A protein has these predicted regions:
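Short, acidic/polar
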Residues: 45-58, 80, 106-113, 175-185, ...
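Conserved, mostly hydrophobic/aromatic
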Residues: 38, 66, 116, 186, ...
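Active-site pocket-lining/capping segments in soluble small-molecule metabolic enzymes
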Residues: 140-166, 216-268, 273, 304-310
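Active-site-adjacent beta->alpha loops and helix N-cap segments on the catalytic face
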Residues: 24, 47-48, 74-86, 105-111, ...
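N-terminal amphipathic alpha-helix/helix-capping segment at the start of soluble metabolic enzymes
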Residues: 19-37, 44, 309-310
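Active-site beta-loop-alpha junctions enriched in small/polar residues
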Residues: 39-42, 69-73, 98-104, 129-130, ...
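Conserved beta-strand positions in the central sheet of alpha/beta enzyme cores
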Residues: 36, 67, 125-126, 195, ...
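Active-site mouth loops of central-metabolism enzymes
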Residues: 36-50, 96-107, 162-178, 256-269
């Protein structure tokens, strides 16, 4: 069986926000091309305005939705909630707020969800969160797995809940099959859609999609794409996530990595090529990790303009 063509492509308009389709599961149900963007909140209050400026430029690209990550150390923090509210209420783009649980208890999660409700945020990406490097770390007690957070979110309101998945397996997982079993439990807990960790070889994703569907995981899976624009960035990414780098991508980094402008252009081109191949093979939902760089996202969106045009 050809794992690359696991579903039939429908090249169509990219979905736009119309005020009534705030929930991501409804956006994805249209089965049209969806390109969404991710941003991270400021670490300090003094950087809030500069992040808002970048977010506004990204929103001008009319993504299907925009996700806002949690800060270092987990949790949501007021910065994440404020940026998510700005995206949705000021920029009229559906917001997806990340939420981690490893360092939180039920009371904290309930309070956070209430804050998000007040801002009209309906989409949550439920994450366990990274384990701190300190080997003596002990979880807060109420949550050990993302599946437990998914259940708790649903108890607190009518949220659309997303989850993370790992085409190459989670770094803590002993085998991809074990990882898929855990993923199935998370989906069964009430996940409406999944977003993948970054990958640089599309064949890895196609194999993962085939295995996931075999396991009965039928929710939409959004492909996460990271445009790599400098050589130091890719070294850090691979060290943290164990992401595989195909030889053709290594050649790009080796050839252009010392020139920031050239590497940025090559990184945009590589990400664009990945996305075009994904859409051509039936993966209609793509999520771009922008690193708060509007010019990078704009370069990719310009390259895709005819594919996602109205």
């Amino acid at each position: 069986m050809d794992n690359r063509r696991y579903s039939k492509i429908e090249v169509s308009k990219q979905i736009r926000f119309d005020g009534d389709n705030m929930k991501i599961k409804d956006i994805l149900a249209n089965k049209k091309v969806s390109v969404s963007l991710e941003v991270f909140p400021p670490k300090q209050s003094t950087a809030f305005e500069s992040v808002k400026t970048a977010v506004h430029k990204l929103c001008d690209l009319q993504p299907s939705f925009m996700s806002v990550t949690y800060g270092a150390g987990g949790g949501i923090g007021w910065h994440t909630a404020e940026i998510a509210g700005f995206v949705q209420n000021e920029c009229s783009v559906p917001a997806l707020s990340h939420l981690t649980c490893l360092l939180s208890n039920r009371a904290t999660i309930s309070e956070t969800l209430a804050q998000l409700k007040e801002k009209g945020i309906e989409n949550i990406l439920a994450l366990r969160g990274d384990v701190p490097p300190d080997s003596s770390f002990i979880p807060a007690g109420d949550f050990n797995y993302a599946s437990e957070l998914v259940e708790e979110i649903h108890k607190n309101g009518d949220f659309c809940v997303g989850g993370a998945c790992y085409p190459e397996g989670h770094v803590e997982s002993e085998h991809i099959d074990v990882d898929l079993d855990n993923l199935k439990r998370k989906v069964d807990a009430g996940v409406d859609f999944l977003t993948t960790q970054m990958f640089f070889d599309n064949d890895i994703l196609y194999r993962f999609l085939y295995k996931a569907r075999e396991r009965g995981i039928t929710v939409p899976i959004i492909a996460g794409i990271m445009p790599v624009t400098n050589a130091k960035q890719i070294s850090r990414i691979c060290k943290l996530s164990g992401t595989y780098l195909p030889q053709r991508f290594k050649a790009i980094v080796d050839r252009f990595g010392d020139n920031p402008d050239t590497m940025a252009q090559a990184g945009i081109a590589y990400a664009t090529e990945q996305i075009i191949d994904l859409i051509a093979n039936g993966v209609n939902a793509v999520h771009i990790y922008t690193m708060n760089k509007p010019e990078i996202a704009q370069g990719i969106m310009n390259n895709l303009s005819s594919i996602i045009a109205d």
